[in-house]
Regions:
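A beta-rich soluble binding module of mature secreted/lumenal proteins
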Residues: 15-170
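Sec-dependent N-terminal signal peptides
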Residues: 4-13
């Protein structure tokens, strides 16, 4: 029984880890990060497959956490899909390192590792390993030079940016 509990604890802890060589941003200001973000690009995952016009809205929860509302359009089903979750800081509130849950007690990492600290207009986010990557912006389009910079940073850290899916917001 102790072995099973240990394996479970290690598994759950691993889900909120940080990929090798990735460092969450410091001087993170949640109040500036709140609001609507557009998903510009991502690595493929089942839960977003086939969706376009994807956004994430972040707002404060009564318990001090963050309400996460992800939304995307499925052309195949001709309808909007939504998922609501909750996020909490893993360490200090000034570090871009949170854990997010969309179902039950299971959390995954939400690591902001690149950010426009001045205006909070773009961010580079990953999950617990390098198969999770998102490029987010405050507008549905991003300048090419900014996109190139973010893709280069992710690539240098070992993310397979050749597999990025660029989200259609039309």
């Amino acid at each position: 029984m102790k072995k099973i509990l240990l394996v479970l604890v290690l598994f759950l802890t691993g889900c909120v880890g940080i990929p090798e060589n990735v460092k969450p941003v410091d001087n993170f200001k949640l109040e500036k990060y709140l609001g609507k973000w557009y998903e510009i690009a991502r690595l493929d995952h089942r839960f977003e497959r086939g969706l376009s016009r994807i956004t994430a809205d972040y707002s404060l929860r009564d318990d001090g956490g963050v309400r996460v509302l992800n939304r995307g359009y499925s052309a195949k089903e001709n309808e909007w899909k939504e998922a609501e979750g909750k996020a909490y800081f893993v360490k200090g509130t000034d570090q871009g390192y949170l854990k997010v849950s969309f179902f039950g007690p299971f959390y995954g990492s939400y690591v902001v590792f690149e950010l426009d600290h001045e205006n909070y207009q773009y961010s580079l986010v990953c999950g617990p390993d390098k198969s999770y990557l998102w490029i987010l912006a405050r507008a549905p389009e991003m300048k090419k030079d900014v996109m190139d910079k973010l893709v280069a940073k992710a690539s240098a850290l070992g993310f397979d940016t050749s597999k990025l899916i660029f989200v259609d917001h039309r």
